[in-house]
Amino acid sequence: MSKVLDEVLQANAAYAANFGEKGKLSMPPARRFAVLTCMDARLQPSRFAGLAEGDAHVIRNAGGRASDDAIRSLVISYKLLGTREWFVIHHTDCGMETFTDDVMADLLANSLETAAIDEKGWHDTGKGPGSTDGWFIKWLTIKNQADSVLEDVRRIRNHALVPASIPVYGYIYDVKSGRLIEVTEATKAGRAAA
């Protein structure tokens, strides 16, 4: 058994021992909102948004981007589970700003091993085999945080399956201060219809 697996199972045993009434939480989120944010381990939506278990849906992916799958989850969150407000929250110092689609595709074509970054950029540390399948994926990398938040809010707002009644707010989480910074233009673009 790996050390990580052992630690996770021990933590779960302690958590389950004190689970209490959480098994009675209803499936729809109590506070009726959803957050789309990055998978970065420094971001803890339960902390920065004041969430308890059962409060909100949290959808995470690399960059917190409005991918087809993220929008699928948001639509299910609304249509079947009743969320009424959505947040798109990207963050400062995001790894998605450190590469382009071409860089990622090249890295994968060379090797499937973990890459490394230094002052010269990303490079492979292992040897092949790689795969050219990375050329067929849109990696949704980020050039500018405010622009990417605006782009994602607009993509959600204009999606045919997203009701005009749902407000979509755009924010950037500052990893140095813990503060949420509104991207005013994004929140404006995500306004619900009156």
Write out the residue ranges for each language-model feature.
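Ordered, amphipathic secondary-structure segments that act as subunit-interaction surfaces
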Residues: L81-C94
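Conserved beta-strand-loop surface patch within small alpha/beta domains used
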Residues: N18-R72
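Generic internal hydrophobic packing segments that stabilize the cores of diverse globular domains
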Residues: A56, I71-L74, E85-W86, D101, ...
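Divalent-metal-activated hydrolytic enzyme cores
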Residues: S2-P29, G64-A66, I76-L81, M96-A194
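Gly/Ser/Thr-rich loops at beta-strand to alpha-helix junctions
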Residues: M39-A41, T92-M96
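Short, hydrophobic/glycine-enriched beta-strand segments
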Residues: E7, F33-T37, E85
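Short glycine/serine/threonine-biased micro-segments
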Residues: F48, A52, N61, D93, ...
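Divalent metal-coordination and catalytic microenvironments
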Residues: N12, V35, I59, V88, ...
